Regions:
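Membrane-embedded alpha-helical segments of integral membrane proteins
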Residues: 35-72
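Membrane-interfacial loop-to-transmembrane-helix junctions in polytopic alpha-helical membrane proteins
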Residues: 16-23, 55-58, 430
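Short, Lys/Arg-rich, polar N-terminal cytosolic tail immediately upstream
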Residues: 1-19
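Internal/C-terminal transmembrane anchor helices
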Residues: 79-103
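N-terminal and secondary-structure boundary signal
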Residues: 97-493
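Alpha-helical transmembrane segments
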Residues: 24-36
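Small-residue packing motifs within transmembrane alpha-helices
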Residues: 27-30, 66, 84-90
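Transmembrane alpha-helical segments in integral membrane proteins
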Residues: 70-82
């Protein structure tokens, strides 16, 4: 059938002759370049076809084959004619297959079955889940209260309450980095409503918050929705009001006198610097000299001056140029990834999210290549471990290997947020009970790419365990065994 359609199109092109104007001449080179680029960039990893740039290149290449290769079928000898037809058919089938890969969810979203459970072995990690969440303040407040009910206080304060105490997470004068996903627009980035609600909660510190909040990420100045990396000022965002960017959120609070700002580390990702203690006050990336012996990752991390003049080393803490000393305890990271499948690594959530901390380009793409060897676990351990991880699963991408790009048309609303101090346990649980459940509801049968119990080499479950090993070597307790996970669930409101 496809071959008959292609033959019909070839005859039509020959009848019509060459179109007027210079567009066909230009498109000959554009289409040919797209085909070459597609083959080089996709290489031996077909999963990369899910990336937006690959999809666009494949569409151009398909049209090029139909316009310039298929018409030759009528004048070539039988053997070469068959080859031309096969090439064109293959390209068209590939394009049609991409269009049919995604299964649509109901407009109202999916109602997942989320259950609590108690760990049967100790030590264990706690996971806190709020259902019916849409990124509102009451959703984050419900999460903080649920955490407090089970011993994890959000606010560090001498005032003891259900949500605060001396062992709480966030002190009144902390510098808090909210690490978001900025590389993709639409539903591929962290929900800006959720980030706004989280900032509101931080500012409600019982002792009065006098610290600073920085919304930050490194989209690597490459790939992403437009091939240029990340943005904190997208015009199409993951929010109820899609014009609400991370930058707009920060500006809303700054206009009220709060020290809230953004920093897109893409802007410094190509600049190698030394630490403040070595006399270098420039913004940029500190890069390790040697790769990690276990995971092979070359660790790097940002150091930068915030909008309000605070010097921050992601690894060493807040730098005081007057005393020449770092205050590590004042710097807190809250890791807020959006939950998605990933074309190469199966799932992207808390651990994979630290790809937005390192500089991929200063190290010849070493960090991204190391993810499958547990490299992001090493980065977490070597730089700064998040005090809290919050998975944004309000809108998700559950299509197997469909992410990380997530257009509005492919996102699925499930209205869940979940938090834990253990990024590995949270990734395991979110993949198994949110992504896999949603994918199954949509009719997908092969869920192996997102299954945390799949430990075949190269799989998500495999590299998640390697990441866990890297964190354990550094002294962190993380769980990848469900018997060591307690899950607490409550509805929002």
């Amino acid at each position: 059938m496809v071959l008959r359609l292609l033959l019909s199109e070839a005859r039509r092109i020959r009848r019509c002759g060459r179109p007027r104007g210079r567009l066909p001449d230009r498109f000959f080179f554009v289409g040919l370049a797209s085909l070459v680029w597609f083959l080089l960039r996709t290489g031996a990893k077909p999963s990369r076809i899910a990336y937006p740039c690959q999809r666009a290149a494949l569409a151009n290449a398909s049209l090029w084959l139909a316009l310039y290769v298929l018409p030759l079928a009528g004048v070539l000898r039988p053997g070469r004619r068959t080859l031309a037809l096969l090439l064109a058919a293959l390209a068209l089938v590939g394009s049609l297959a991409l269009l049919g890969l995604q299964r649509r969810a109901p407009a109202e979203g999916l109602q997942l079955e989320i259950r609590g459970r108690a760990a049967s072995q100790q030590p264990s990690s706690s996971i806190f889940v709020v259902t019916g969440a849409r990124g509102r303040y009451e959703d984050v407040r419900a999460l903080i209260e649920l955490m407090g009910e089970h011993g994890l206080k959000f606010y560090r304060s001498s005032r003891v309450s259900p949500v605060s105490g001396p062992d709480g997470l966030i002190a009144r004068d902390d510098v808090v980095i909210i690490k978001v996903n900025s590389q993709w627009n639409e539903r591929g980035g962290t929900n800006t409503d959720l980030v706004k609600a989280l900032i509101m909660a931080i500012l409600e510190h019982p002792d009065g918050f006098v610290g600073e909040i920085v919304i930050a990420d490194n989209g690597q100045a490459q790939y992403g929705s437009y091939g240029r990396g990340g943005s904190l000022s997208w015009d199409r965002n993951n929010a109820e009001d899609i014009t609400q960017s991370m930058e707009k959120v920060a500006q809303q609070f700054a206009a009220q006198g709060y020290k809230v700002s953004t920093y897109l580390w893409d802007e410094i990702t190509l600049k190698r610097v030394r630490e403040y203690s070595e006399g270098d006050l420039e913004d940029g990336y500190v890069v390790y000299e040697r790769p990690d012996p276990y995971t092979g990752v070359i660790v790097s991390y940002p150091k930068f001056r915030t909008k309000y003049g605070t010097y921050v080393s992601f690894k060493l803490g807040v730098w005081d140029p007057r005393t020449g000393a770092y205050n590590s305890s004042r710097l807190k990271v809250i890791n807020v990834p959006v939950l998605k499948t990933h074309a190469i690594y199966g799932v992207t959530a808390c651990v994979k999210h630290y790809m937005g901390v390192v500089s991929d380009r200063l190290t010849n793409h070493n960090p991204h290549n190391s993810v499958g060897r547990g490299g992001m676990g090493t980065v977490m351990a070597e730089t700064r471990y998040p005090v809290l991880n919050i998975v944004d699963a309000i809108w998700i991408n559950p299509h197997p290997r469909g992410g990380p790009a997530t257009p509005y048309s492919e996102a699925v609303r499930v209205n869940v947020i979940a938090a834990s101090t253990d990024p590995v346990a949270l990734d395991y649980w979110a993949a198994k009970y949110i992504l896999m459940q949603a994918a199954s509801r949509l009719g997908y049968r092969d869920l192996s790419s997102m299954d945390p119990d799949n430990t075949q080499a190269g799989s998500f479950g495999y590299w998640l365990r390697l990441s866990a090993e890297a964190l354990r070597r550094a002294g962190y307790f993380v769980a990848v065994d469900e018997s060591r996970m307690s899950v607490y669930v409550r509805p929002s409101g």
